[in-house]
Amino acid sequence: MNKILGLLFGIGLLIFVCALARAQKSQSGENVDVRGGIDHGEFDRLLKKYVNEQGLVDYGTWKGSASDISALDHYLDQFAAKIDKPTQGNEKAASLVNAYNALVLRWILSNYPTESIWQLKNSFTAKRNDIAGRKVSLDDIEHGTLRPSIGYRAHAVLVCAARSCPPLQRFAYTAENFEEQNDRAYRRWLAREDLNKFLSNERKVEISSIFKWFKADFDKAGGVPKILGRYASQSVREFATSGNYDIKYLPYNWGLNDQGAHGRNYSRVQLIFDNLFK
């Protein structure tokens, strides 16, 4: 009997580990080009209308507005046409960050209500999005383009519709203000005590698993403590910079970043189930 129980436990543990591995986003993709001159004004308006100060989205109301669904589609249409000369630098970065976030929002709106983006098939890997005359995936934008070009800075601004993501900002990124906007997004992310905690009295920080998953990106910029110290609140900045503390990585909540009830009770067990059986 003990051998049977041990075997069943081992099989269960293997299934758990495999499912959890599938639940972690991949880290590969192809480069994506984008044209210059995209107007982000309408996307900025939509973000201000449907995203609150906590970065949660009013998907229910947005889905009920045919005109604002159409407005999001028209915004994304700007990215679709084939181009001869792609843009570069901050214009490319700002446009692709906006494209990623807008495509995630459109994907959720198309499938709402849902409890998590992981309940939807191939959200990150499917080449279903039209940019510069070809089909690209969200992974192409993040891992094939933005991480190689702007490194650790990508991780505060790309929002994959999860409650543990950095908060979705209520503005569209622009070439002219991208550096300042990126800094602002980092500061707001690290100031959220439900997402990152600096416990100086205990010589401990409890931070997002993003800092573990993409450690190589932060190491290229001087390491996690340096980045934490750069953007943490003034009251804990010296402590964060020191690196003289234990690091705990918080469990990632993949529940939908919905202002309503969807995603609030999405569990780690449900995440594993969704990755095994969807």
Q: Which sequence ranges carry the predicted segments?
A:
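Sec/Tat signal peptide C-region and signal peptidase I cleavage site
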Residues: L20-R22
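Interaction/scaffold regions that mediate signaling and macromolecular assembly across diverse proteins
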Residues: K25-K278
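Bacterial N-terminal signal peptides
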Residues: L8-F16
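Bacterial N-terminal signal peptides that target proteins for export
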Residues: M1-F9
